[in-house]
UniProtKB/Swiss-Prot annotation:
Active site positions, chain numbering: C327
Key words of the record: ATP-binding, Cobalamin biosynthesis, Glutamine amidotransferase, Ligase, Magnesium, Nucleotide-binding
Cofactor(s) needed by this chain: Mg(2+)
One MF term in the entry's GO annotations: hydrogenobyrinic acid a,c-diamide synthase (glutamine-hydrolysing) activity
Record text about domains: Comprises of two domains. The C-terminal domain contains the binding site for glutamine and catalyzes the hydrolysis of this substrate to glutamate and ammonia. The N-terminal domain is anticipated to bind ATP and hydrogenobyrinate and catalyzes the ultimate synthesis of the diamide product. The ammonia produced via the glutaminase domain is probably translocated to the adjacent domain via a molecular tunnel, where it reacts with an activated intermediate.
Miscellaneous: The a and c carboxylates of hydrogenobyrinate are activated for nucleophilic attack via formation of a phosphorylated intermediate by ATP. CobB catalyzes first the amidation of the c-carboxylate, and then that of the a-carboxylate.
Originating gene: cobB
Lineage of the species this protein comes from: Bacteria, Pseudomonadati, Pseudomonadota, Alphaproteobacteria, Hyphomicrobiales
Pfam family, one: GATase_3
GO biological process, one term: cobalamin biosynthetic process
Official protein name in the record: Hydrogenobyrinate a,c-diamide synthase
Entry's family note: Belongs to the CobB/CbiA family.
Length: 436
């Protein structure tokens, strides 16, 4: 599939706003889109879906096997998409400790031309050195256009264009400074798309700005250039948690990877959804229950009072149904959760741990996992960890994973398992072996 990547020299350059505006503008033009987010981020894909009307897949070149990334891109083509629009993560060449797994690696793997969004608010002629350096840093990554962001005036724009002219890298557009084109944030990144009351208006405004200030025909020329890679349709996927998987999905449990659901369905699993915040129970015939991450610390009181949900999960665990929680889901499986105000809320009590959001500490990075039992996965896994909550009390129980960081440093054992119930703070992305 043809497409392009929106990347930047650093986080905070405006690439998410540009990506959303372009997705909505291209949708209005009738393009059938395949939105992609590089890396493990859960929040941006929901915005991509809102802008494009299509589910967004995470493609993570550190945590995913290259053949899985290729297969997922092939799946998007099968669904009828014509233009893949990828948003990079952090700076273009930023990855794990060794630099691997960057947006540049994904662009190379999928042979995507890169459009570089540069924050010009505090520079003029120096932009030439920056763009030249990025364009020369890796010859296998092609920067085929630049979008100037946060331009102060027509004079400022003329200076920037003049500085870049000798480089031969096309300037696709210049976006004026506009505080209205910013998205609200909180501790794990942007506020979730479903909680952004004015999102539709924002997306339309962003699309209008892109149409007015970006040469859309020149952008189309970039993504229509010949492709050189062959996508693979069939590749081994992670085993599903069960044959009939009930997945918690609402504002408290919003962090789940689309590629996992797609892979589980390909392996024959049925997936249903339920909302703990609405006090819904999982389907009675589910043989596995998945509580993904999200923001349980923001909804702890409602979860504590969701009697139907709590009873159903407890009964399922007593019957031996697989119950698996990741990050926020892991916290909900514990005994209590302390919110930011220091109030303790009773959780499901299926795992012997107590967690706190009042005593915050950042835990962030890619993880290599060796499963220790309790899940259908017996091969090494790749995962991501990102949370501020801390474990304040933990009783003895079997561990779920042996953990190393991206550099291979031993981080000890993590997660808990009691009977058919298990969980950890790790977000599993893919396996790193030969067999599933």
């Amino acid at each position: 599939m043809k497409g392009f990547m929106i990347a930047a020299p650093a986080s905070g350059s405006g690439k998410t706003t540009v990506t959303l505006g372009l997705l909505r503008a291209l949708k209005r033009r009738g393009e059938v889109l395949a939105p992609v987010k590089a890396g493990p981020d859960y929040i941006d894909p929901a915005y991509h879906r809102a802008a494009s009307g299509v589910d967004c897949f995470n493609l993570d070149p550190w945590a995913m096997r290259p053949e899985l990334i290729s297969a997922l891109s092939s799946r998007m083509t099968e669904s009828g998409a014509r233009v893949l629009v990828a948003e990079g993560m952090m700076g273009l060449f930023d990855g794990a400790i060794d630099g691997k797994g960057s947006s540049a690696d994904l662009a190379r793997l999928l042979d995507l031309p890169v459009v570089l969004v540069v924050d010009c608010a505090r520079q003029s002629h120096s932009i030439a050195a920056l763009v030249w350096g990025f364009s020369q840093f890796r010859k296998d990554v092609l920067i085929e256009g630049v979008i100037l962001n946060r331009v102060g005036s027509p004079r400022h724009e003329a200076m920037l264009r003049g500085a870049l002219a000798p480089l031969g890298v096309p300037v696709l557009g210049a976006l004026p400074r506009d505080p209205a084109l910013s998205l609200p944030e909180r501790h794990l990144g942007l506020v979730q798309a479903d909680e952004h009351a004015g999102l539709e208006s924002f997306l339309e405004q962003a699309a209008d700005v892109m149409e007015a200030h970006i040469d859309m025909d020149a952008l189309q020329t970039i993504w229509l250039r010949p492709k050189r890679y062959d996508a693979m349709a069939n590749v081994a996927r992670l085993k599903p948690l069960g044959n009939r998987i009930a997945v918690a999905r609402d504002d408290a449990f919003a962090f789940a990877y689309m590629h996992l659901f797609e892979g589980w369905r390909r392996r024959g699993a049925e997936i249903s959804f339920f909302s703990p915040l609405a006090d819904e129970a999982p389907k009675a015939d589910a043989d596995a229950i998945y509580l993904p991450g999200g923001y349980p610390e923001l909804h702890a009181q409602r979860l504590a009072g969701a009697s139907r949900f709590r009873t159903a999960i407890g009964d399922a665990a007593a019957r031996g149904v697989t119950v698996y929680g990741e990050c926020g889901g892991y916290m909900v499986l514990g005994k209590t959760l302390e919110d930011a105000a220091g109030v303790h809320h009773p959780m499901l009590g299926l795992l012997p741990l107590e967690t706190s959001f009042a005593r915050r500490k950042l835990h962030l990075g890619y993880r290599l996992l060796e499963p220790l039992g309790g899940l259908p996965w017996d091969m090494p896994l790749k995962a991501h960890e990102f949370h501020y909550a801390s474990i304040v009390r933990e009783e003895k129980a079997d561990r779920l994973f042996r953990v190393r960081d991206a550099s291979g440093e031993n981080l000890g054992e993590a997660g808990l398992r009691v009977g058919s119930v298990s969980g950890s703070f790790m977000h599993v992305i893919d396996f790193s072996g030969e067999a599933a």
